[in-house]
Amino acid sequence: MTSLVMRLANLAKTYPALAEDAKAIELVDQHVQGLPLRPFFEPVSVTLVSKGKRGDVLNGKREVLGVGPEELTSWTRHVALGTRCRMRALEDPIVGHLQAGQTMPAMILLRSHLEAAALAAHCLRELTAAARQGSVETLKELIPKTLFGTALKKHRDKVSVGELLKVFEGDTVQICSAIDSLDRFYYQEQSEGKLCIAYSVLCEFAHPNHRGVKDFMVASERPGGWEITYQLEASADPQLVARGLETLLVSMRAGYAAGELLLSWEFREQDGQLVARGPEVGSTSGGPPDTE
């Protein structure tokens, strides 16, 4: 029995109403644990860095040149397998903190988990759209953002940071767009931004917003106001624990499914054209998609 399974069992004992979600998470974990991490080939690639509005390359656009079968295979594997490893590393501590009633660290880690799942869903969405359009133009910018994007980019002009960065490292994907992709992927026609709202709630805990520390204070009514007492240990909120576990289950299902769909894509060159074959799209090459 793994640490995660034991934590889920203990959580279900404390909160019997969560037993169904806890069991569902255990089943997803068992399935993912059996998935292979197959090695893949990563080719040397060239990134074109354009000058920005101020005539420098710091804020310029970055595009991968020569996007072919090897580049796309490598990219989809990086995103899918990197997402899987990141998500799995977060799940045990998330459940552990929920079990201990420590909602703040659980929600902060859950936010990161949701972001990782969202990246896989966003890349799947953009890849599918590109295949249907028969063009990789949009992927030329997306690939470096997902592989070489860094938050340090905004500090590039500082010597101490500039020495750490390579010229091809630039902007990251817009996380709100990625969360929207995750919501659309999971809920399909019923998508109405539920995960976008959940993500905003998680941000309340990750950012120094007052809503995130409410469980650390006790308010007692006094004439004309309240007496506020802060305590170092937060009081457990059963409703928040339930919502956290439910969101984790959705994030796991959606993130791992998106990653596996990315891995299912196949790319090859035929008659000088790129041919991409993936779920729901069939085989596409340089024009409107047709199904083999």
What is each model feature region?
Residues 1-115, 119-125, 129-292:
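A cross-kingdom marker of C-terminal helix-rich interaction/assembly modules
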